[in-house]
Design a protein with these regions (language model features):
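C-terminal beta-strand-rich structural cap/linker in extracellular carbohydrate-active enzymes
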Residues: 387-411
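Catalytic cores of secreted or luminal carbohydrate-active enzymes
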Residues: 281-326, 400-408
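Glycan-recognition surfaces
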Residues: 130, 179-295
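A structural motif
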Residues: 409-675
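Aromatic-lined carbohydrate-binding/catalytic grooves of carbohydrate-active enzymes
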Residues: 48, 52-157
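Structural recognition of the beta-strand scaffold that forms the well-ordered cores
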Residues: 27-33, 61-68, 107-112, 144-149, ...
Length: 675
C-alpha cells in the first residue's frame, strides 16, 4: 500500500469504539417495501427482487431486499412468543423468502419495533421484552439486516437510547452478524410533546456506538405518493447535515429512503426526474445508505440508468465514508464538498433550491483545492476541462450539478514531508512527534525524522503529548499498544528508556506540564470518563460531563496563574471544560457548546488559554479564555473545510502566536503559525 493510502485510511485511536458489524464498510444499498408496496406480499417481494436482478440494480449494489412493517401476522406472536409471518401475504413463510433472495445474490432485511406491542394501536409488532428471542429468531431465519422502528416506543414515551442499546446487545449475542438500522422518526413535525432525548435529531449522540445506521429525521414521505414532496426532501437532507461528524466507515447517518418518481393517482409524479436525481445525488454526496423506496418495476429506463450511474454510486461508496458538507451558500442554493480517497480529489454538488434555473459557481478554494483543477461531470459522465479559481454551470430548478474535482490540496503552513497515522504533537523549539506509517513514535526535528519505536511491540496508539523544558529536556507521553500510559525523556543529549505509568486508557493521554516534577496526565478511561494521575499519585477519575462517556482525547494546559484547564469532546459532540485551582480544587464541568468532529486542543499563551477544535464541517474554530471566562467561538479562516484530520498539536510561540502541527488531508504533517 502506498504511504498516502496508509495515511488516508488511518485515524486517531478514538474512544468510545464506534459500532462496526463488518457488513457495511461503505454505505449499504438496497430496496425497502414501505414506500413502494405498503403491506407487502410474498409474491410482490419476489417480483421486485427479480426486477432488481434483471434491471442491473443488484449488480450496481442495491442488494438488500428489506421487508418493512406488514410482514407479520395480525397477532404477531404464537403461543410460545415467537414472531409469526402473515399467512395470507407470506404463505411460504419468511425462511423460504430469505432462501429465494439468497439464491439470487440478494440479502434479506426485516422489520420490527423497539417498543412493547400495544395490540396494534401504535405498531404492528414490538420486540420489547423479546429482544434476545427475536434476534435469535432473525438469526435462525438467516436474516441479513434488521430495521428497528420506535412507534410503540413513542407511544409509551420511552427513551430510545437505552432500548436500542439493549437490542444491539441482543443482536451481538444472536450468533449471526446482522446489519442494524435504528429508526426513531419522532420530531417536532409529529406535534407530540417529547424530551430532547426522545427526538430523532438526538439519535447521533448514542447510535454510532450501537448500530450501523440511524435515522436523522422523520419519514421523508407518506405511504401514498403526495404533491408538494420537494420541501420534504430538503427538510430531511438539511436535518441529516447537522451532524456529519457522527458518520464514518461502518456507521452512517440515515436521512430515509430514496423515493424517485412515485406516480400519484392523477398520473403525475410526486417528484420530477430532476428532483429525484437531486435526492440521489445529495444522498451520495452525504455518504448515506442508498435504499430505494419506490417500486423499481414502475421506474422508467432513464431513471433506472441514473440510479445505476457508477460514478455517482462511487462517490457514495468512497471508502473514507466522509459525509459531504456545505462550504458555501446563497439565496439560490448551496455548494457541498466531500473529500474522496486519494490526493486532491473532491466530489462537489451545486444545488439549486430555487424554482428557477440558476448559474451556480464553485470556488475551488472553498473545497481546499488550488492550481489547475480538472472538472468531471458525474451525472453526464463527461469531462468538463481544466479550470483555475472556479467553475460555473447553469443548474435547473430543484436541480444539481455533480462534479468531481481533481487538483492540488492547499493546506496552511509547511509540509514537513512525513506521513502520520494519527494527530501529531509539537514541542517548543519546533520538534514534531507523531505516530508514523508503521505505528511507531517518530520525531521530526532539524529536517530529520527519527524512529523512537514504542513501549510495547514497537508501537503507540493515537496522538502523543510532549513538553520541552529547560536544558533541552523533552518529556513524551503516549498510549502504548497495550493501552497503558508510558513516558520517555530526552535529557543530556539522549533518549532514556520507556517508563510505564499504568492505567487502562481508551485514548491517548495529554499532559498539563509545569515542570518535570509537577505535571498531571489526563486521558479517557475505558469507562468513558476522564482519568488523571501525577508523578507520584495513581490514576483517579474526574468523571464526565453529565455522567456520559466522552469521545476521544482530553486536552490539558496550565495557565500563567498555575490553574490546570481540561477540555473534552462530549457525547453530543460539544466541548466541555473544567479547571483545577492552585489549591487543588476542581470546578464543575462547563459547556462551551459547539459541534466538533475531533478532540479539542488547549494551549496556554501568555495570560490566556486558547482552545482549538475541528468543527462538524471540518473547519477550524477557536475559543479564548481570558479574564476568568471563555469568550465564544470564532472561525479560523486560513483552514478550509477538510484541511486536516483529528486534532491540532499546539505550543505557545513568539509574540502571542501559536505554533501548531496537524495531519493534513493528504496524510502529511504540516507546521503552521497561528496569530
Amino acid at each position: 500500500m502506498a504511504p498516502d493510502a496508509v495515511a488516508r485510511t488511518a485515524v486517531d485511536q478514538g474512544a468510545p469504539g464506534f459500532y462496526d458489524s463488518g457488513l457495511a464498510p461503505t454505505p449499504y444499498m438496497g430496496w425497502n417495501t414501505y414506500y413502494g408496496l405498503g403491506a407487502p406480499t410474498e409474491k410482490e417481494v419476489r417480483s421486485v427482487a427479480d426486477r432488481l436482478v434483471s434491471s442491473g440494480l443488484r449488480d450496481s449494489g442495491y442488494d438488500i431486499v428489506w421487508l418493512d412493517g406488514g410482514w407479520q401476522a395480525d397477532n404477531p406472536r404464537d403461543a410460545q412468543g415467537h414472531l409469526v409471518a402473515n399467512p395470507d401475504r407470506f404463505p411460504s413463510g419468511i425462511p423460504a423468502l430469505v432462501s429465494y433472495l439468497h439464491k439470487r445474490g440478494l440479502r434479506a432485511g426485516i422489520y420490527t419495533d423497539g417498543g412493547t406491542y400495544d395490540g396494534g394501536k401504535s405498531c404492528g409488532l414490538g420486540s420489547r421484552g423479546y429482544y434476545d428471542q427475536d434476534a435469535r429468531q432473525f438469526a435462525n431465519w438467516k436474516i441479513d439486516a434488521i430495521k428497528v422502528d420506535f412507534l410503540c416506543g413513542i407511544g409509551a414515551k420511552l427513551d430510545p437510547g437505552p432500548a436500542y442499546k439493549e437490542f444491539s446487545d441482543a443482536v451481538a449475542k444472536s450468533g449471526r452478524r446482522m446489519l442494524l438500522n435504528l429508526c426513531n422518526p419522532l420530531t417536532d413535525d409529529w406535534g407530540l410533546p417529547h424530551t430532547p432525548e426522545q427526538d430523532a435529531h438526538n439519535t447521533y449522540v448514542y447510535a454510532p456506538a450501537i448500530a450501523d445506521s440511524w435515522r436523522t429525521g422523520t419519514d421523508i414521505a407518506w405511504g401514498t405518493p403526495s404533491p408538494g414532496e420537494w420541501p420534504n426532501i430538503l427538510r430531511n437532507m438539511d436535518a441529516n447535515a447537522w451532524h456529519p461528524e457522527a458518520q464514518g466507515p461502518g456507521h452512517y447517518n440515515d436521512p430515509d429512503y430514496l423515493i424517485p418518481m412515485r406516480k400519484m393517482t392523477d398520473g403525475s409524479y410526486e417528484l420530477t426526474q430532476e428532483e429525484s436525481t437531486s435526492q440521489f445525488v445529495m444522498w451520495a454526496e452525504m455518504g448515506s445508505p442508498l435504499v430505494l423506496g419506490s417500486d423499481p418495476r414502475t421506474l422508467s429506463d432513464s431513471m433506472l440508468a441514473t440510479l445505476r450511474n457508477p460514478e455517482i454510486i462511487a462517490v457514495d461508496q468512497d471508502p473514507l465514508a466522509v459525509q459531504g458538507v456545505r462550504v458555501a451558500t446563497d439565496s439560490a442554493g448551496d455548494v457541498y464538498s466531500k473529500v474522496l480517497q486519494g490526493r486532491g480529489q473532491r466530489a462537489v454538488v451545486l444545488l439549486n433550491r430555487s424554482d428557477q434555473p440558476a448559474q451556480r459557481t464553485v470556488h475551488f478554494s472553498d473545497t481546499g483545492l488550488g492550481g489547475p483543477v480538472r472538472v468531471r461531470d458525474l451525472r453526464a459522465r463527461t469531462d468538463r476541462g481544466t479550470h483555475t479559481g472556479s467553475y460555473t454551470v447553469e443548474v435547473p430548478a430543484h436541480g444539481t450539478a455533480f462534479l468531481k474535482l481533481t487538483g492540488a490540496d492547499v493546506l496552511p503552513g509547511t509540509d514537513l514531508g512525513v506521513t502520520a497515522t494519527a494527530s501529531p504533537a509539537v514541542a517548543s523549539g519546533g520538534a514534531a512527534f507523531f505516530r508514523g506509517p508503521h505505528g511507531s513514535l517518530v520525531e521530526k526535528a532539524d529536517g530529520r525524522a527519527r524512529d523512537l519505536g514504542g513501549p510495547v511491540h514497537g508501537g503507540i496508539l493515537g496522538q502523543p503529548a510532549v513538553y520541552a523544558s529547560a536544558g533541552g529536556r523533552i518529556d513524551v507521553f503516549v498510549r502504548g499498544d497495550d493501552s497503558r500510559a508510558y513516558r520517555r525523556i530526552y535529557a543530556d543529549g539522549r533518549w532514556g528508556h520507556w517508563q510505564s505509568l499504568g492505567g487502562q486508557l481508551a485514548d491517548a493521554p495529554s499532559v498539563a506540564f509545569t515542570d518535570p516534577a509537577h505535571w498531571t496526565l489526563l486521558a479517557t478511561g475505558t469507562d468513558g470518563t476522564v482519568v488523571q494521575r501525577g508523578p507520584a499519585s495513581g490514576w483517579s477519575s474526574l468523571g464526565a460531563p453529565g455522567d456520559r462517556q466522552v469521545y476521544g482525547r482530553p486536552s490539558a494546559a496550565v495557565d500563567a496563574q498555575g490553574r490546570v484547564h481540561v477540555a473534552v469532546r462530549g457525547a453530543a459532540d460539544d466541548v466541555w471544560t473544567r479547571s483545577r485551582d492552585t489549591a487543588g480544587e476542581w470546578s464543575g464541568w462547563t459547556s462551551l457548546g459547539g459541534t466538533v468532529s475531533g478532540s479539542p486542543t488547549l494551549v496556554a499563551v501568555g495570560d490566556t488559554v486558547l482552545l482549538y477544535a475541528r468543527a462538524a464541517d471540518y473547519t477550524l474554530w477557536q475559543q479564548r479564555y481570558a479574564e476568568g471566562a471563555w469568550q465564544g467561538w470564532s472561525k479560523r479562516q486560513e483552514f478550509p473545510s477538510a484541511a486536516f484530520d483529528g486534532a491540532l498539536g499546539a505550543v505557545a510561540g513568539p509574540e502571542g502566536a501559536v505554533d501548531a502541527v496537524f495531519r493534513g488531508v493528504d496524510g502529511h504533517v504540516y507546521r503552521t503559525r497561528i496569530k
